[in-house]
Amino acid sequence: MPDAFAELRHELAVANRILANEGIIDAFGHISVRNPKDPNRYFISRHRASELVEPSDILEMTLDSKPVVPTNVRLYSEMVIHGEIYKVRPDVNSVCHHHAPSVLPFCATGVELVPLFHLGGTLGSKVPFWDSRDELGDTNLLVSTPEEGASHARALGPHYMLLLRRHGASLAGTSLRECVFRSIYTTRNAELQLRALAIGALGPLSPGEVEKCGGHNLGPRGVERAWEYWVTRLQKAEAMWAAAGLPRMKDLGRIARPQTAGLTPARSAPRRVARAASKTRARNRR
């Protein structure tokens, strides 16, 4: 039977690998996307490191974070992060949770993360904190129960980024590609803030600048341009892996094309990828 969501599963697998390739997600972390035909369901990978996720790993879940089709495969322990946000935020169609090194100092100290450059406008007007101790006392710091997931979702409120004390960050987007865009550029903003603090006083964006920068950067042309760039970087990385005899994801290039009407479809880079692989094989023979 044909899979009506084959393209979506493929794109979600690519999103996982992009976030790994860009250093946002390592062995731990995950990203999901809401079912575009049924808002009471979402898609997410089985329990696996994002760098290794394949379309066949993608499962469909209810908003209670239970598999739609019963399965014996292992699931992420923090699925409720996704399901509970989808329950209370109908505007959100993608959720990412990560522990990027640049955001962890803010999680450890409680220092506010503020937008400092134009692409940092994707932070939004405020980045709230969630401290699980406030409602739940001592825990293992994972968000793994419905109660913890609901508390986490309440802390996010109407915002698009949440910092978890002593843990990491959760991001939301109106689309999968927007969520990837926000996940990457909010970590870049965190890197900038850490460096800027070593030089002098911060000069954050004004509320008006945040609104205008965020609206511009998250428009279709900005998101699609960045997506094409990240897919190309991933193609090059996977070509190097293939040259070294490591497995790579099939049909990666086809997902680089923009989804927005009026945009010129992205050209794949098979020749560049082949040349990179050839050069690597030549070096390995020396």
Q: What do these predicted regions represent?
A:
Residues 1-286:
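Glycine-rich flexible loops
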